[in-house]
Amino acid sequence: SHVPLRELYLCAVQELSRHPELVEDVLKLQRWTEILNCPSDEEKESRRKQVRPLFRHFRRIDACLQPREAFRGSDEIFCRVYTPDHSYVTIRSRLSCRVGEILALVREKLQYSEDQPVLPGNLILVAVTSAGEKAVFRPSDEAVFTTLGVNTHLFTCEPSELETLLPLPEEIHWTPGDSKLHDMSAEEVANQLVVFDWELFSCVHEVEFVCYVFHGEQSRWRPLNLELVLQRCSEVQHWVATEILQCQSLPKRVQLLRKFIKIAALCKQQQDLLSFLAVVLGLDNPAVNRLRLTWEGLPGKFRKQFQQFESIADPSRNHKSYRDLITSLRPPLIPFTPLLLKDLTFLHESCKTFHGELVNFEKMVSQSDLTCLLFLSHLVAMDTETSPSHLQTKAYVRQLQVIDNQNLLFDMSCKLEPKDT
């Protein structure tokens, strides 16, 4: 059996950070593993039915290193559903599953749980953010998994217990310390950000944009892959703020600022405007922006460069600077997806789809022109090959640990540099 060889490969990947001299051996192991694991047609069909992880829910290092594939509503995933005491059950469900079906699966699990001696009555499904905000789903809601925020979790409880739901402890507490990012080069991190963005973005079909804009939340067919791209944008923004605010050393914070500005520049150079603007907006987070001593330690060259980046992110005059940049670039490129959706939504809501019984073709052409950029981007293949020497960075970039509670981020900021400093 070739299973032990794969296990050896995974162990070697985990040891790369401590033993970089293993790079060539890991490369050979990877090649042999790929050869031995080359699937037959029957195996390929079977893999389509396997349970697949969302990118924020990786549990094993080999899962996060696999290339991303487009999600369909029929795909199955594992998901944790928590109870008010923070115990949880793990369910296996289709992505398009209705909330009523999810609750039925949860009830079945709780029935055999030792932690639940009494079977609960009427259950509801709730999304709880790290800030404690709650959103109750309707039994008819579908495909709720991809709508969750970065650190949002699913809870189930009886209606009378709704107000008792609290975020998980790990979402409201933080531990200061040095980041793994200090040991990684800006080039490696930027390259892996771009690679992952391309994998996610290439999974999005143009129809998902049309569905998102024309149907919104009322659509029975959710734009699953597009929602994951939007989540990734939010995740990268909060990652930047989290890394800087967890760093207790002033000189190291300055180093992180320099590194993030360099990462943004490299993403822009590779025409990944999604991560480029996400990093810039992360540095513009009020909790980071107020760190006067940290920003004063930044060399003038980097401050000037960041000011140029800020001007591109400036929303004034209908994002003119960003639009000028887009016009100057040639595909393939990854646009800043939230702004693209904003443009499509504005065009849809400001123009009627029909004039009497006639279709407004002018509106359709304008919508087509906006989505044409996506089509061209998908047509051109990107050279995104990576070597095993970057596997640790690759795993890190695909499993970002972030704090998305703005109040907590601001408290961390004030502890680093109190208001009177």
What are these regions (language model features)?
Residues 37, 122, 151, 191, ...:
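Detector for Asparagine
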Residues 3-228, 234, 239-246:
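Intrinsically disordered, Pro/Ser/Thr-rich cytosolic linker and juxtamembrane tail regions that serve as
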Residues 17, 111-112, 269, 289, ...:
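A generic secondary-structure boundary signal that marks alpha-helix termini
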Residues 129, 280, 350:
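A broadly conserved detector of short glycine/acidic/proline-rich loop/turn motifs that flank catalytic sites
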Residues 1-7, 209-335:
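Core of folded catalytic or high-affinity ligand/protein-binding domains
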Residues 2-72, 104, 295-421:
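Intrinsically disordered, proline- and charge-rich regulatory regions
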